[in-house]
Swiss-Prot record:
Lineage: Eukaryota, Metazoa, Chordata, Craniata, Vertebrata
Composition bias type Acidic residues, residue spans: 1210-1221
Top-rank taxon, per record: Eukaryota
Known outcome of mutating residue 38 to W: Reduces L27 domain binding affinity to PALS1 L27 domain
SUPFAM superfamilies noted in UniProt: L27 domain, PDZ domain-like
Protein name per UniProt: InaD-like protein
Ranges of compositional bias, category Pro residues: 1195-1205
Major place of residence: other
Gene3D superfamilies xref list: 1.20.1440.360, 2.30.42.10
Region of interest (Disordered), ranges: 452-473, 1169-1221, 1332-1360, 1622-1642, 1781-1801
Pfam families: L27_2, PDZ
Length: 1801
């Protein structure tokens, strides 16, 4: 029998709910009927009665066991099943009938000592004129007395009085009938309960008394009925009330609830309190507020509590019949019913009350007239106890609702005290009683209020709330907000359940009323009330229900790359921080936006019953992506601005301060790392296969349905070479299998699908398949597959090369080998994408290589189990051989491998291919191919090749340092003739039969627990050239400046695409081959772009996937997983395909000479030197350029899955057919778009296509419009493009619907031959962000800057021009025209092209002259805000990509504070700013994405920072002296008087990653607020003399809470003038020049500033120093520089520099560089020589290369003889030619990159 049946029943109901929900998610409806029946049974009243009866029988058994033998127990059970003992059940005469007189009855077994005058006088005094009762109750031998008491503090000197709260029906006290509710107990066993007895002692007396309990109680006379009575007793209705109207109301519950709320008690009756508008009762129309409920069904509810009535209503089922009455004719008190917990008498107003001192208080009367059914519009709060002013407390006005009666009256103010309502004195009433009085008052309400005459209110109130709600009762915890001592105790220790029921009676009552007040039984209201109880009154809880459906596949396909899945489904972006998940933005027109309920900054608490609060971001986002609709969202909105208050924290945990600007984490809007789901055509195609003895010839896997995450689909994984499926040509990897003969595979598990396929008998099999929808550029290679005829079937056996290897259904996440892939800042941070990313040819291997690389980049571990693969044809007994030398790696070994999770593969067959079979079969093999010499146990000769579908979905990159890599023995069994034709994949291992071998891949990368490796490789001597100087000639600058990058993964934050590349310097590794042993490396990658970084860079190339430890490569210890191979024995692999790389390595001599790059580790702030670089000869340039031109193709778009099919062919006719087919598909793709579709091909000239592009003026729509056409460009010559055309594709790269950044990256990488798809719509002109204008002509000698309308000239020996430039959307037409008109000089900057002969692959075209990321003078591209460091003393523009986290900044200050500036308070280490590494605490933020924060308030700054997009552009100012020394703090003492029971009225916050505790908020009306000296952002240095500078927030909070009386604080405040002066200095040093030439280019600004500051310094110094002999003498400066160190200087000058042929001098010195550490170099020093090499006659670029490649001990000879003044003036004049607009001009984040690339290189 259950211990607590009610609780157990609720738990069972909850379990049933969860079970039903899970079954619904799985689509299982078979158990619905049984579960519903079970559910209804548990909810039925009969079942509740049975449970109650069981409990009563158990209780009776306990009673009977303890009743003496001479007693007879007369008991009964009530209708509900409760145990009731009848009167006279104890026959020994101990129970007496009540006496009606107040004198001592002769029946009493004891008589009070009347002679004791002192005792009597005390009792009389305590009774205060009330009726005195003497009661003697015999405590039973078992069980309790049957009543509970409550202790309430009276207003008389803080004395605590004990009142009877409740008398249990059927108990000893109830049968005695003398003890009543609300009786005040004056004495217990002759002990008076005066001020000498505490309430704990009184309760102990009640509980510990044995035998007879003698009580003296005081009771109000029952005949008192005056409306002004001070009695708080529940008014007892007359025994015979004549009702004016009695009516029977029947309501049929339709599931939405009854729609009314009740209130009341036993004696006053239960009354209808509220009627929900639109609810059932409201629609019925008969029930009215104020109706007394007399009977429900056949149950008389008079005398019941409201909770009992609520239970009766719940048990009624759907039909509720009630007898209600209204308009009593009898005299009923207007005093509202009060709960039993209140005292019986209203104590008189103390002499210190507000009314007594007219000098301090004024009393006034207000008359309010209700409008139709509306509330009065005031919100009240109660305070019980002694306030900090010593005055009596009571009910205060907390807030006034705008538009209400109180609001229009105008006389009532917040903090007014309400003393009477309609003449009824309410002093001493609790909140909910006053609420009832106000609610039950008539149309006209008279209020008597008291207000302090002084301006500074000392009322004990919190700041007013903005919540616009009607007056509503507060929950019991809020009843007495500060000083309540309500202690409720059961005095008799009854049965545990009854005790619990009594102790929680009030809470249950209130909760039941709240539920009924809303829509009863409504899940939304239950959710709301549950969270309201948890969060308290400071939060508004909202429940929203969404039922969204993705309309069709095309819609999801169109947007899936632009928005995260959860954003697409819910229509909100979610930022997460520390377990809180906030809505950061709402998608316009999305589901949540349509609902109109939620706002940004609302916190998401729960979705579909899953609590998100407290969960990590990864858990929350993962759940939101998978949770099925409809969605029930529970959100909360903070109603107050206070934080983790020192006084009264709202939550148990420390609240997050408001000043943490970015609590949140942003979702990468591109969702680069979450992979992308495949989509299939809804059209089902029937493929007929003839099953033979070998099966159908394909393998399958299950895959998450992109449209329903709870379901899976069956997908063709791979085809068996020369199998039935491959020969038919109708089935291809990636096809979705929907049916087999008559069997539908919808929602079928993988195992079931396998069984169905295996069970199909041999013969004709009908397969229903859906082809994948693809958008990739390789669509053109799959035209045969989509054609209606099958006439070309026979070609597939010879042309499909290893298709399945390109099918990875979940895009992977990044390298696992974290130590090697840390982010690192480089010396030249600007990453021009220029020519290093030449687009590649449309080679057939592209798709394969791309997906191989994705496979190499390892998906998350948990995703491995989602892609189990089963080969469904053959049997798998072949794998059961226990021979350890047969390295086929059964499942058990895979499971043992610690770094690789089990894939749960089942191999149902293999196929053995003879070496001399037709090459088509070998070329078409799928999966991982294993060659084993140990095949003899199966009876095959060594020449045979065993092919097996090893289908590991990913190969984690295992560090080469781990020595337990599993290795197989591979022999030279591959026929190399077929290799020339095959498209070599990861799974194919070509080995020369006779010569040296090269292991390109390992079939299964798994690690065993023990050292089970076979000794396969013999040790041989190897030689490694570790110093670059030993092979200088091969290290061209094309390697040194390569920008490809492997993604890094932030621990705990998911995987994130980095902002830019951090490759170390190239190095040479020599590996000597060993006879008959492979090199021991496997490679991955190729031409295809694998990943796009956030700044538009592309990740591509050949990478080392694994190095076998005992192999020749492994023995060198010089190669590791993730290294990028730049060159092999003179063959450039930077743009090589996978097959070309394999051939190059295979054909390399002995030794094999690799040039490789590794990712460097990430320093936090210090920038790193980039790479060593040497110029290469013209022949090398030419050769490399020829190779690159041979391999030019397109960069693929962000990948859709599955990848497209490929068909190798060289037939020109087929190419034409393919193009026609592709064009047809393109037209189909955009058939729904309005306008005329055009497909053209253009040949770029040296200036690009001659197009100017802009976006859509509607920022929510992503479009790319042609706004200008150069009359001399290819587009104008072709004549088919017009202004207003919208670009959809370039070289099959889809631009439609893409962001500006994506489009920019694709445009930049376009090759010379460009295929454009665009649409022409007449309305386009109205949609364009920039008014169209013609682009003036340009020539190689004079390219005018047109704000980005011209192509960037990326010069390589003056030979090639690359790129289509976009017009920044923030530039208006007028600005663009004015810039053209104001150009003073041709901006074909000759110093760029002539000084720096860049290598073909360079992507740092403009940064070679600048090591610090700051502007040299060579090109305006030298400052990249994404990478440039922050120079102290000047305003800097920086960009930070948030990735998967928020910015992670906490700020202080604002125009509404004395600080008058927005200053970074802390940089949180998990945020994007910390990863970026440039922002420090103390930096001032001047602008955020064009929003000027110089004059913004604190809240405005927080809003601006929170509502930032993915890329955040900041203008910051740093003064290193600030916020670091206390000399910058204004230190002053503040003394606050802390009153008893009150706090100081301030909230604090500490740094999580540093020391210091700061004031985050001042509570209105608190001690700190009244003092008026403290502000937000002040630092608490000490408390009562105790140093708090290094204390934690918790420590300071505890000390402040425990402090009493006078609290002495020492406060530190950043000096108000310090930031102003700092900004003035900044403006003097930088802004003044900008005012003189407002168009100064950002790249010149730092140099001009530095030089002019230096000039100013020199001017104020002694003029004699200019000719000082010591300054003019050469100085030798020695610098020690490690490989990872940044030199940290910028130079200017050199032959052919824009300043003229002047000597090279130091233009800037970065504080974090090694040069600055010497403290011997100065800005303006002329560099005479570097390591003994004179610089006379060298060009700027030559000197740059010398410095960049100088490591170790660097000797500089310098002379301080540069004429800085002349150079600074010359720079200032030059900078006016750039006219980029004021630096403070507004701009959009999308335009930041373009704004810095407006001039030619």
């Amino acid at each position: 029998m259950p211990e607590n049946p009610a609780t157990d029943k609720l738990q069972v109901l909850q379990v049933l709910d969860r079970l039903k929900m899970k079954l619904q998610e799985k689509g299982d409806t078979s158990q619905n009927e049984k579960l519903s029946m079970f559910y209804e049974t548990l909810k039925s009243p009969l079942f509740n009665q049975i449970l109650t009866l069981q409990q009563s029988i158990k209780q009776l058994k306990g009673q009977l066991n303890h009743i003496p033998s001479d007693c007879s127990a007369n008991f009964d059970f009530s209708r509900k099943g409760l145990l009731v003992f009848t009167d006279g059940s104890i026959t020994n005469g101990n129970v007496h009938r009540p006496s009606n007189n107040s004198t001592v009855s002769g029946l009493f077994p004891w008589t009070p000592k009347l002679g004791n005058e002192d005792f009597n006088s005390v009792i009389q005094q305590m009774a205060q004129g009330r009726q005195i009762e003497y009661i003697d109750i015999e405590r039973p031998s078992t069980g309790g007395l049957g009543f509970s008491v409550v202790a309430l503090r009276s207003q008389n000197l803080g004395k605590v009085d004990i009142f009877v709260k409740d008398v249990q029906p059927g108990s000893v006290a109830d049968r005695d009938q003398r003890l009543k509710e609300n009786d005040q107990i004056l004495a217990i066993n002759h002990t008076p309960l005066d001020q000498n007895i505490s309430h704990q002692q009184a309760i102990a007396l009640l509980q510990q008394t044995t035998g007879s309990l003698r009580l003296i109680v005081a009771r109000e006379p029952v005949h008192t009925k005056s409306s002004t009575s001070s009695s708080l007793n529940d008014t007892t209705l007359p025994e015979t009330v004549c009702w004016g109207h009695v009516e029977e109301v029947e309501l049929i519950n339709d599931g939405s609830g009854l729609g009314f709320g009740i209130v009341g008690g036993k004696t006053s009756g239960v009354v209808v309190r509220t009627i929900v508008p639109g609810g059932l009762a409201d629609r019925d129309g008969r029930l009215q507020t104020g109706d007394h409920i007399l009977k429900i069904g056949g149950t008389n509810v008079q005398g019941m509590t409201s909770e009992q009535v609520a239970q009766v209503l719940r048990n009624c089922g759907n039909s509720v019949r009630m007898l209600v009455a209204r308009d009593p004719a009898g005299d009923i008190s207007v005093t509202p019913p009060a709960p039993a917990a209140l005292p019986v008498a209203l104590p008189t107003v103390a002499s210190k009350g507000p009314g007594s001192d007219s000098s301090l208080f004024e009393t006034y009367n207000v008359e309010l007239v209700r409008k139709d059914g509306q509330s009065l519009g005031i919100r009240i709060v109660g305070y019980v106890g002694t306030s900090h002013t010593g005055e009596a407390s009571g009910i205060y006005v907390k807030s006034i609702i705008p538009g209400s009666a109180a609001y229009h009256n105008g006389h009532i103010q917040v903090n007014d005290k309400i003393v009477a309502v309609d003449g009824v004195n309410i002093q001493g009433f609790a909140n909910h009683d006053v609420v009832e009085v106000l609610r039950n008052a008539g149309q006209v309400v008279h209020l008597t209020l008291v207000r302090r005459k002084t301006s500074s209110s000392t009322s004990p109130l919190e700041p007013p709330s903005d919540r616009g709600t009607v007056v509503e009762p507060l929950k019991p915890p809020a009843l007495f907000l500060t000083g309540a001592v309500e202690t409720e105790t059961n005095v008799d220790g009854e049965d545990e359940e009854i005790k619990e029921r009594i102790d929680t009676l009030k809470n249950d009552n209130i909760q039941a009323l709240e539920k009924l007040e809303k829509v009863p039984d409504s899940p939304e209201n239950e959710l709301k009330s549950r969270w309201e109880n948890l969060l308290g009154p400071d939060y508004e809880v909202m429940v929203a229900t969404l039922d969204t459906q993705i309309a069709d596949d095309a819609e999801l396909q169109k947007y899936s790359k632009l928005l995260p899945i959860h954003t697409l489904r819910l229509g909100v972006e979610v930022d997460s921080f520390d377990g809180h998940h906030y809505i950061s933005s709402i998608v316009s027109g999305g589901p949540v936006d349509t609902l109109g309920l939620l706002q940004p900054e609302d916190e998401l608490l729960e979705v579909n019953g899953m609590q998100l609060y407290g969960k990590s971001r990864r858990e929350a986002v993962s759940f939101l992506k998978e949770v099925p609709p409809p969605f029930t969202l529970v959100c909360c909105r903070r109603l107050f601005d206070d934080e983790a208050s020192v006084d009264e924290p709202r939550r148990t945990e420390t609240s997050l301060p408001e000043t943490e600007v970015d609590h949140n984490m942003d979702v990468n809007t591109e969702e680069d790392d979450d992979g992308e789901l495949a989509l299939w055509s809804p059209e089902v195609k029937i493929v007929e296969l003839v099953k033979d003895c070998k099966g159908l010839g394909f393998s399958i896997l299950d895959y998450q349905d992109p449209l329903d995450p709870t379901r899976s689909v069956i997908v063709i994984r791979s085809l068996v070479a020369d199998g039935v499926a491959e020969r038919s040509g109708g089935l291809l990897p990636g096809d979705r299998l929907v049916s087999v003969n008559e069997y539908c595979l919808d929602n079928t598990s993988l195992a079931e699908a396998v069984e169905i396929l295996k069970a199909v008998p041999p013969g004709l099999v009908h397969l229903g398949i859906c082809k994948p929808l693809v958008e990739d550029n390789e669509e053109e290679s799959c035209y045969i597959l989509h054609s209606s005829s099958n006439e070309d079937k026979t070609e597939f056996s010879g042309t499909i090369h290893d298709i399945n290897s390109s099918l990875i259904l979940e895009a992977p996440k990044g390298f696992r080998d974290e130590p090697y892939f840390k982010e690192e800042l480089v010396d030249e941070p600007f990453l021009d994408l220029g020519k290093s990313f030449h687009s590649q040819q449309k080679e057939i291997e592209q798709s394969k290589e791309a997906w191989e690389m994705h496979e190499f980049l390892t998906p998350r571990l948990q995703e491995m189990d989602e892609e189990r693969e089963i080969l469904v044809d053959e049997e798998y007994e072949l794998y059961q051989d226990p021979s350890p030398s047969m390295e086929l790696y059964p499942l058990s070994h895979i499971q043992e491998a610690t770094p690789v999770p089990s894939v749960n593969e089942l191999h149902f067959g293999t196929q053995w291919l003879h070496d001399n079979e037709p090459s088509e079969s070998q070329e078409a093999r799928t999966g991982r191919t294993v060659y084993s010499q140990e095949a003899q146990p199966y009876g095959y000769c060594p020449e045979n090749v065993m092919k097996e579908n090893f289908v590991m979905e990913s190969l984690p990159s295992v560090p080469s340092t781990e020595g337990n890599s599993q290795q197989g023995r591979f022999d030279d069994l591959e026929n190399l003739n077929s290799l020339a034709k095959t498209s070599l994949d990861l799974g194919m291992i070509p080995n020369d039969v006779q010569g040296p071998s090269l292991l390109i891949d390992l079939p299964v990368v798994a690690q065993r627990r023990e050292q089970e490796d076979l000794p396969l490789y013999q040790h041989q001597a190897t030689r490694v050239i570790s110093k670059a100087s030993a092979y200088t000639g091969m290290l061209s600058s094309r390697y040194a400046t390569d920008t490809c990058e492997l993604p890094e993964r932030e621990e705990g934050e998911g995987e994130e695409t980095p902002n830019f590349s951090h490759w170390g310097p190239p190095r040479i590794v020599e590996i000597f081959r060993e006879p008959n042993v492979s090199l021991g490396i496997s490679i991955v990658g190729g031409q295809t772009v694998i990943k796009r970084l956030k700044n538009g860079e592309e990740l591509k190339g050949i990478f080392i996937k694994q190095v076998l430890e005992d192999s020749p490569a492994g023995k060198t210890n010089a190669l590791k997983t993730g290294d990028k191979i730049l060159e092999v024995s003179g063959v450039d692999l930077q743009n090589a395909s996978h097959s070309e790389a394999v051939e190059a390595i295979k054909n390399a001599g002995n030794p094999v000479v690799f040039i490789v790059q590794s990712l460097s580790s990430t320093p936090r702030v210090i920038p790193n030197v980039h790479n060593k670089a040497n110029k290469i000869t013209g022949n090398q340039n030419q050769d490399t350029q020829e190779k690159k031109e041979k391999r030019q193709g397109t960069a693929p778009p962000p990948m859709k899955l599955p990848p497209p099919y490929k068909a190798l062919t060289d037939d020109s006719d087929e190419n034409e057919e393919e193009d026609a087919f592709t064009d047809q598909k393109i037209r189909q793709r955009y058939a729904d778009l309005p306008g005329e579709l055009h497909i053209i091909e253009l040949e770029k000239d040296k200036n690009g296509l001659g197009l100017s592009l802009a976006g859509n003026k509607d920022r929510s729509r992503m479009s790319i419009f042609v706004v200008g056409i150069n009359p001399e460009g290819p587009a104008a010559a072709d004549g088919r493009m017009r202004i207003g055309d919208e670009l959809l594709e370039i070289n099959n790269q889809i631009l439609y619907g893409r962001s500006h950044q994506n489009a920019s990256a694709i445009i930049k990488t376009a090759p010379s031959k460009v295929k454009l798809v665009f649409i022409r719509n007449e309305d386009a002109v109205n949609q364009m962000a920039v008014t169209p204008f013609p682009v003036p002509s340009s020539s190689p000698s004079s390219i005018e800057d047109q704000s980005g309308t011209e192509p960037i000239s990326s010069e390589e020996d003056g030979s090639v021009e690359v790129g289509i430039k976009q017009l920044p959307e923030s530039e208006s037409f007028k600005l663009a025209v004015s810039q053209m008109k104001q150009q003073k000089y041709p901006t074909k900057v000759s110093f760029s092209s002539q000084e720096i002969p860049l290598a073909p692959a360079s992507s740092y075209h403009s940064t070679d002259a600048d090591f610090t990321g700051y502007g040299g003078f060579q090109a305006p591209l030298s400052v990249d805000p994404a990478t440039c460091p922050i120079v102290p003393g000047q305003e800097m523009i920086i960009e930070i990509s948030k990735g998967r986290s928020g910015l992670g900044l906490s700020i202080v200050g604002g125009k509404d504070t004395p600080l008058n500036a927005i200053v970074i308070h802390e940089v949180y280490e998990e945020g994007a700013a910390a990863r970026d590494g440039r922002l420090w605490a103390g930096d001032q933020i001047l602008e955020v994405n064009g929003v000027d924060l110089r004059n913004s308030s604190h809240e405005e700054a927080i809003t601006a920072l929170r509502q930032t997009p993915q890329k955040v552009r900041l203008v910051v100012y740093r003064d290193e002296a600030h916020y670091r020394d206390e000399e910058n703090l204004e230190i002053f003492p503040v003394d606050l008087q802390k009153k008893a029971g009150r706090g100081l009225g301030l909230s604090i916050v500490g740094k999580r990653n540093g020391s210091g505790v700061f004031i985050s908020d001042i509570v209105k009306g608190g001690a700190a607020d009244l003092d008026g000296r403290l502000i937000q952002g002040d630092q608490i240095l000490s408390v009562n003399g105790e140093d708090m500078r290094n204390a934690s927030q918790e420590t300071v909070a505890t000390i402040l809470k425990c402090a009493q009386g006078l609290v002495q604080l020492e406060i530190g405040r950043l000096r108000a003038g310090s930031w102003t002066s700092a900004r003035t200095t900044s403006q003097n040093s930088q802004g003044s020049q900008q005012s003189a030439h407002s168009s100064c280019h950002p790249s010149f600004a730092p140099v001009i500033t530095g030089l002019q500051n230096l000039v100013g310094t020199k001017r104020v110094s002694d003029p004699s120093q200019k000719n000082s002999g010591t300054d003019m003498e050469p100085r030798t400066v020695e610098i020690n520089r490690e490989l990872s160190d940044a030199l940290g200087i910028s130079i200017a000058g050199g032959r052919g520099s824009p300043l003229g042929d002047i000597p090279v001098f130091i233009a800037m010195i970065q504080a974090s560089g090694v040069a600055a550490r010497t403290q011997k170099l100065k800005v303006g020093d002329r560099i005479v020589s570097i390591n003994g090499q004179p610089l006379d006659g060298l060009s700027h670029a030559d000197v740059v290369n010398l410095l960049k490649n100088a490591y170790g001990r660097i000797i500089l000879q310098v002379v301080a003889d540069t004429n800085i003044s002349a150079i600074a003036a010359q720079l200032e004049n030059m900078s006016t030619g750039y006219h980029l607009g004021s630096p403070t001009a507004e701009h959009h984040p999308e335009d930041t990159e373009e704004q810095l690339q407006m001039t030619a290189d």
